[in-house]
Amino acid sequence: MEVIKISPRGYCYGVVDAMVLALRTAQNFDLPRPIHILGMIVHNAHVVEAFEKQGIKTLDGEDRLALLDQVQEGTIIFTAHGVSPEVRKKARDKGLTVVDATCPDVTKTHDLIREKVAEGYHVLYIGKKGHPEPEGAMGIAPDHVHLVQKLEELEALDLPTDKLIVTNQTTMSQWDVKHLMDAILKRFPGVEVHNEICLATQVRQEAVAEQVGEADLCIVVGDPRSNNSNRLAQVSEEIADVPSYRIADLFELDIEWLRGKKNVAVTSGASTPTPLTKEVITFLEQFDEFNPATWEKKRTVNMAKILPTVK
């Protein structure tokens, strides 16, 4: 089978930095124990399991503030998705040692919101409900930041037009954002636009749109909770018109999807360990639908070594 390896793909710098910071925290025995991560450090269950083996427990749930009730002492790591000021204050008030792994691109958006709200602006925030990044952004100024995911939510808003900005979750599809941005500009012609899709997300989406066209199928390797992974599959189907499946790893790959296919494109989300993507590519390269000996899926990755190396 011919495999088109979409490039760039996989880990972005924000994800790598967050994981390396968490690993250094685990290796620093001057920091108080136990060590918890407030939410998934990145949206990948394999990564979470690998950190558990490093002695770092992940607290999973949508409400970061409520999750903090489970921690009475030790060190807390904030994830790459960022947290609200209220969460930061609660962690300090509990006497916890804080390690902040917030992605710099997310911090940039938080700073923008903070600055504009101080100037009297309201903020339209395009994002996905239930995702930790919008939770953190909205928490900066709950009365002034308005989450928009669908057009009908926009139509229900009654906001002043003289001091209004629009920004977005960094991992959204740029085409989804444009769709809502256009509607917002039509509804609020004077709105100030700040497109905050991070460069890593943007170039990975553009790579799929531009490189997947000759494929019969696109496989996206990424966790089901990874927004950017799901968006890559969406880009393949809606922009490039190529059928796509998102899989967490090789063992979610259905052989039936491959029947009659000659060219398969592979990409991966920004939080997907590189070895897992390579494992999928290696399997596809040897796959022959007429040779059952090539159908068996075997784990070739050492799952204890999927985290980045701390230098």
Swiss-Prot record:
Instruction: Name the cofactor(s).
Output: [4Fe-4S] cluster
Q: What is its EC number?
A: 1.17.7.4
Write out the entry's keywords from A to Z: 4Fe-4S, Iron, Iron-sulfur, Isoprene biosynthesis, Metal-binding, Oxidoreductase
A Gene Ontology BP annotation from the UniProt entry: terpenoid biosynthetic process
Binding of isopentenyl diphosphate, residues: 43, 81, 131, 226, 228, 271
Query: So where does (2E)-4-hydroxy-3-methylbut-2-enyl diphosphate get bound?
Result: 43, 81, 131, 170, 226, 228, 271
Q: How is the cofactor bound?
A: Binds 1 [4Fe-4S] cluster per subunit.
Residues engaged in binding dimethylallyl diphosphate:
43, 81, 131, 226, 228, 271
Residues noted as binding [4Fe-4S] cluster in the record, renumbered to the chain? 12, 103, 198
Name the reaction it catalyses: isopentenyl diphosphate + 2 oxidized [2Fe-2S]-[ferredoxin] + H2O = (2E)-4-hydroxy-3-methylbut-2-enyl diphosphate + 2 reduced [2Fe-2S]-[ferredoxin] + 2 H(+); dimethylallyl diphosphate + 2 oxidized [2Fe-2S]-[ferredoxin] + H2O = (2E)-4-hydroxy-3-methylbut-2-enyl diphosphate + 2 reduced [2Fe-2S]-[ferredoxin] + 2 H(+)
- Taken from the record, one Pfam family name reads LYTB
The record's similarity note reads: Belongs to the IspH family.
Q: Which HAMAP family match?
A: IspH
Query: In its UniProt entry, what is this protein called?
Result: 4-hydroxy-3-methylbut-2-enyl diphosphate reductase
Q: Which organism is it from?
A: Brevibacillus brevis (strain 47 / JCM 6285 / NBRC 100599)
